[in-house]
Amino acid sequence: MTGEEAVVVTAVVAPKAGREEEQPPPPAGLGCGARGEPGRGPLEHGQQWKKFLYCEPHKRIKEVLEEERHIKRDECHIKNPAAVALEGIWSIKRNLPVGGLKPGLPSRNSLLPQAKYYSRHGGLRR
């Protein structure tokens, strides 16, 4: 194999009907009873071990699958992506003077636009 990892998986399968041959014992340490799993005893008579070879997919295929998984995850987490993106750029709370008006009759001068000066170093100034 060219740099890919392979794993040998063993499984127990029952033989087809009509076969009465003696099967070799399973490799040491791979049987269900050898691992000490609860509720599993040693192999019954007539069962045989089958080996399967697992090869990992190519690196590019794994990258594409991971990208798709991230895209799906991001779609689920962001409810309103436009509002989230816009909040970092422009916010009503930061950019407009809201509040500060006292209940009752406001003065006529407070309703007029106030002179504001913009400095790229200091932001908005009055």
From Swiss-Prot:
InterPro entries: C11orf97-like. One of its GO terms (cellular component) is ciliary base. It is found in: Cytoplasm, Cytoskeleton, Cilium basal body. Its main location: cytoplasm. Coiled coil: none annotated. Residues 13-45 are annotated as: Disordered. Keywords: Cell projection, Cytoplasm, Cytoskeleton. It comes from the Eukaryota. PANTHER family: CHROMOSOME 11 OPEN READING FRAME 97 (PTHR38326:SF1). This is Uncharacterized protein C11orf97.
